[in-house]
């Protein structure tokens, strides 16, 4: 679990251009980390590539925070 969590935080920081220290499990991509809708699409694509999964558009809309991403990836890998 820790490795998935760490990798997701690294991807979020890289995709959104923020310091990894700002990325907490509770961080909302839009509200806390300044992402816009295009950023979130690119973030989902990066997660799909990293973890070799496909995230449906419906599920992608539900992934709004770092913890949402951790939970989704953990449940689907």
UniProtKB/Swiss-Prot annotation:
Gene this chain is encoded by: acpP
HAMAP family cross-referenced by the UniProt entry: Acyl_carrier
Organism: Citrifermentans bemidjiense (strain ATCC BAA-1014 / DSM 16622 / JCM 12645 / Bem)
InterPro entries linked to this entry: ACP, ACP-like_sf, PP-bd_ACP, Ppantetheine_attach_site
Post-translational modification: 4'-phosphopantetheine is transferred from CoA to a specific serine of apo-ACP by AcpS. This modification is essential for activity because fatty acids are bound in thioester linkage to the sulfhydryl of the prosthetic group.
One biological process term in Gene Ontology: lipid A biosynthetic process
Family as reported in the entry's similarity comment: Belongs to the acyl carrier protein (ACP) family.
Protein name in UniProt: Acyl carrier protein
Span of domain Carrier: 2-77
PANTHER family: ACYL CARRIER PROTEIN, CARRIER DOMAIN-CONTAINING PROTEIN
Keyword Chaperone: no
Assigned GO CC terms: cytosol; membrane
One Pfam family matching this protein: PP-binding
Keyword set, alphabetical order: Cytoplasm, Fatty acid biosynthesis, Fatty acid metabolism, Lipid biosynthesis, Lipid metabolism, Phosphopantetheine, Phosphoprotein
């Amino acid at each position: 679990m820790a490795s998935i969590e760490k990798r997701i935080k690294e991807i979020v920081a890289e995709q959104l251009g923020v310091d990894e220290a700002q990325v907490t499990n509770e961080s909302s991509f839009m509200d806390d980390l300044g992402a816009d809708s295009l950023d979130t699409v690119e973030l989902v694509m990066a997660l799909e590539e990293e973890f070799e999964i496909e995230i449906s558009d419906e599920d992608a809309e539900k992934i709004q925070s770092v913890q949402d991403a951790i939970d989704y990836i953990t449940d689907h890998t």
